[in-house]
Amino acid sequence: YYSGYDRTFNLSGINVYGHGSDISFPNVDVVYGYRKTDVFGLGGVFLSDWFILRYVLGYFSTIDKNNSIERPSSFNPVYYDSLHFTYPLMEEAKYFQSTFQIETELPFGINLVAQYFSHDTLTYSSDSLPVDQEIDIPNLEIDPNEMKPSNFFTPGMGVPLAILTDRAFFLTLDKEMLDEQLKLSFTSMIDASSIDKKEISSDGESSKEHSSKGLLMELKMTYSLNQNLDGTIAITKINGDSSHPEGDSYPFNQMEDFSHLRFELKYFF
């Protein structure tokens, strides 16, 4: 059991400011905060001569304790001197996460680690955001038609991957050679989530389940130049999903530009 505040901030509400009684040119201020989260965890390990199995389950109960977000305007407070509207979200949610992992050694001294991760929001509640115009939030474009607080909910504790997807497969293969001076590794992450996709035909509008196709792969080689210095070369490739219903908002589509080739030198003191 663990209780604490989330490590990542969340959308806590929106304030609308004006100049005196005039709200002709309002300033919309987005307020962030950190939810309080209680965590209940359960895990187990099974060992055999051939493989190792690990399982971890976490149940999370989180609440935004900011019942009031009233405060002076952070932008030009001399002009925007009056708070006209305030919309605290007061989020509450319960969600769970689980990981199942198997570790084994393959022929030729290759180590394999395979993992399945899942996340599900069990319940969610919040106040509404009665906003009828587009709002500019850093790194987030909000369409009034999609202005549902549940669309912006992200877990603040647990596996960080839950921000990207609710289900994923991991696979890691690595091998050490030359008296453990050289290490080769291959890592992949496959998005296994699904989402309803609306389709319009002559028979009307229908909903069809779409399986996500996001994929991340990395091939890495690390060589120990001496006891204190390692050199690494790695290639990372990220594939999105051009047919995903979320379009450019799909996280793997956003990450495609982060595909790269990198070189590293690490010195250990």
Where are these regions (language model features)?
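Long, internal scaffold/assembly segments composed of regular secondary structure
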Residues: 1-94
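Transmembrane beta-strands of outer-membrane beta-barrel pores
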Residues: 2-6, 48-50, 59-63, 116-122, ...
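Outer-membrane beta-barrel translocator domains and adjoining extracellular loop/strand segments
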Residues: 9-17, 65-74, 124-131, 188, ...
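Extracellular loop and loop/strand-boundary signature of outer-membrane beta-barrel proteins
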Residues: 26-30, 79-89, 155-160, 195-207, ...
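Residues that define the transmembrane beta-barrel architecture of outer-membrane proteins
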Residues: 36-40, 92-98, 165-169, 213-215, ...
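Outer-membrane beta-barrel architecture
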Residues: 43-45, 99-103, 172-174, 220, ...
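Repeated loop/turn-to-beta-strand initiation elements of outer-membrane beta-barrel proteins
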Residues: 50-54, 109-113, 179-185, 227-233
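Outer-membrane beta-barrel "beta-signal"
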Residues: 171, 253-269
